[in-house]
Design a protein with these regions (language model features):
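Activation segment signature within eukaryotic-like protein kinase domains
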Residues: 91-92
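Conserved activation segment of eukaryotic-like protein kinases, specifically the C-terminal portion
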Residues: 145-158
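Activation-segment/catalytic-loop signature of the eukaryotic protein kinase fold
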Residues: 54
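Protein kinase catalytic-loop region centered on the HRD/HxD motif
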Residues: 97-109
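AlphaC helix of the protein kinase catalytic domain
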Residues: 73-83
Length: 161
């Protein structure tokens, strides 16, 4: 992951680099990243990262996205323990709002890896939901809805169908 500065726009971007030489099954990983970025490119919500560009060649895959200033909720919990109720309620409302937005898409998007490490706490008090690697568009009567994915201990109960 790199931090880049677009000097013309005076904006910071994060660049995620995936190299063929660092991954055993590069094509499978690359296809997963293409699905993830194509999904995120269509979405516009203040609690979601924006994809700026995708650059690929045969050996490297780059995703240019908004830089999200802040730290994961998991870091705040490790460092400071339980958080004040007012903050937790605010974060929960924001997460419910972004999940409602994802579910309102046509077809609905199912986010399947909700956990503190995937919630970025920004300095302004807002949150951003990250890591859409296991998210997918809902498909009617798809048995994959009960496939256990995500992080054990945080997985949705319907995955244990």
């Amino acid at each position: 992951m790199y931090l880049a500065m677009n000097e013309k726009a005076n904006k910071q971007w994060a660049i995620k680099e995936v190299r063929k030489d660092g991954i055993r099954d590069f094509e499978v990983v690359k296809q997963g990243l293409i699905v993830e970025t194509d999904m995120l490119k269509k979405l516009r919500h203040p609690s979601l990262p924006s994809i700026i560009d995708v650059i690929e060649d045969e050996d490297t895959f780059l995703i240019v996205m908004d830089y999200i200033e802040g730290n994961p909720l998991s870091s705040a919990l490790e460092e400071f323990g339980a958080q004040p109720q007012e903050l937790v309620i605010s974060w929960a409302k924001q997460l419910c709002d972004v999940l409602g937005y994802l579910h309102s898409q046509n077809p609905p998007i199912i986010y399947r890896d909700m956990k503190p490490a995937n919630v970025m706490l920004k300095p302004d008090g807002n949150v951003t939901l990250i890591d859409f690697g296991t998210a997918r568009e809902f498909k009617e009567k798809n048995l994959a809805d009960t496939t256990c994915l995500g992080t054990v201990g945080y997985a949705a109960p319907e995955q244990f169908g």
